[in-house]
Amino acid sequence: MTIKVLVVDDSALIRNLLGQMIEADSELSLVGMAADAYMAKDMVNQHRPDVITLDIEMPKVDGLTFLDRLMKARPTAVVMISSLTEEGADATFNALALGAVDFIPKPKLDSPQDFNEYQDLILEKIKSAAHAKLKTQRAAPAVVVQPSHKPALSSRVINTQLVAIGASTGGTEAILSLLQQFPAVMPPIVITQHMPPGFTRTFAERLNKLTRLNVKQAEDGERLLPCYVYIAPGDQHLEVIKVGGSFKTRLTQGDKVSGHRPSVDVLFNSVAECAGANTTAAILTGMGKDGADGMALIDEQGGKTFAQGEQSCVVFGMPREAIKRGVIHHVVELPQLADKMLNYLASLKRD
């Protein structure tokens, strides 16, 4: 059964381009193209699409307002088409908080290779969105959430442990939820979230505002500090290396690994090699299998491994692959994951 797709964009060029890409795939059926939210509403009611690609910046009714109304009236898998501006990035994360499944930047097609790569990516995201679990809508929190009482971590744990997290589709909101449940005093945390360039800095700034931790986009060669969270920049691999007695970041522009740059496998492999048994790692919602190999190495080196449970995942791809490998010690739904990780870290002071 084909996946019914509706394209909503005020640009005729973008509509036709996306329509051309969708019609070239036998698994997808283009049921309509709308230039504004009013046309889109009629087409949603008429065609009942499985997936909608939605432009954020539209006349009359903007994409966020339409998305908000859609998710209340007829929840549907939505992939946002986002501009590479700071305002566009902010709007994108608001859209994900409102219930959009995923996003992709507007196409910049300067060569046939660009066209082919963009087509592969948008088709992959549409197909993944069609099978995604739509979460209950929740507005982006406006204030820092104060977590309930958490176990105190010893200074030894804070200064010797490393926490590593990997995610893809659905990960921006999952990471926010997880970090909001962590206390202000934690070991260094390194995160790879599949995301294109131009969005990771805004993502880090958003997390910094909405959690008790210090969150930043990682820079090359910086020392990892307790109470800080380091986000892999878009289109760069984030690795952790040990220099003297300190953990430091290394950013590289190497080939894609497991189909991605940044890659969760690259981060997890590096953490396993330099932190070994002092690693606590979690793999969250996402499509594909990136992170499974890295989790296997962390397990082999004696680290503690966690995976998000299927019920709370938007896409149960990456956690499933790691679980299938037999390298995950604890499978935990997102609401309980922070407590499980903290209880493990707190238990280390008694060892």
Swiss-Prot record:
CDD domains: CheB_Rec (cd16432), REC_CheB-like (cd17541). Its EC number is 3.1.1.61, 3.5.1.44. Residues 156-348 form the CheB-type methylesterase domain. One of its GO terms (cellular component) is cytoplasm. The active site is at residues 168, 194, 290. Phosphorylated by CheA. Phosphorylation of the N-terminal regulatory domain activates the methylesterase activity. It comes from the Bacteria. Gene3D superfamilies: 3.40.50.2300, Methylesterase CheB, C-terminal domain. Signal peptide: none annotated. GO terms for biological process: chemotaxis. It is found in: Cytoplasm. GO terms for molecular function: phosphorelay response regulator activity; protein-glutamate methylesterase activity; protein-glutamine glutaminase activity. Keywords: Chemotaxis, Cytoplasm, Hydrolase, Phosphoprotein. Residues 4-121 form the Response regulatory domain. It is an enzyme of class 3 (hydrolase). PROSITE patterns: CHEB, RESPONSE_REGULATORY. Pfam families: CheB_methylest (PF01339), Response_reg (PF00072). InterPro entries: CheB-like, CheB_C, CheY-like_superfamily, Sig_transdc_resp-reg_Me-estase, Sig_transdc_resp-reg_receiver. It catalyses: [protein]-L-glutamate 5-O-methyl ester + H2O = L-glutamyl-[protein] + methanol + H(+); L-glutaminyl-[protein] + H2O = L-glutamyl-[protein] + NH4(+). The modification 4-aspartylphosphate is found at residue 55. Contains a C-terminal catalytic domain, and an N-terminal region which modulates catalytic activity. Involved in chemotaxis. Part of a chemotaxis signal transduction system that modulates chemotaxis in response to various stimuli. Catalyzes the demethylation of specific methylglutamate residues introduced into the chemoreceptors (methyl-accepting chemotaxis proteins or MCP) by CheR. Also mediates the irreversible deamidation of specific glutamine residues to glutamic acid. Belongs to the CheB family. This is Protein-glutamate methylesterase/protein-glutamine glutaminase 2. The gene is cheB2.
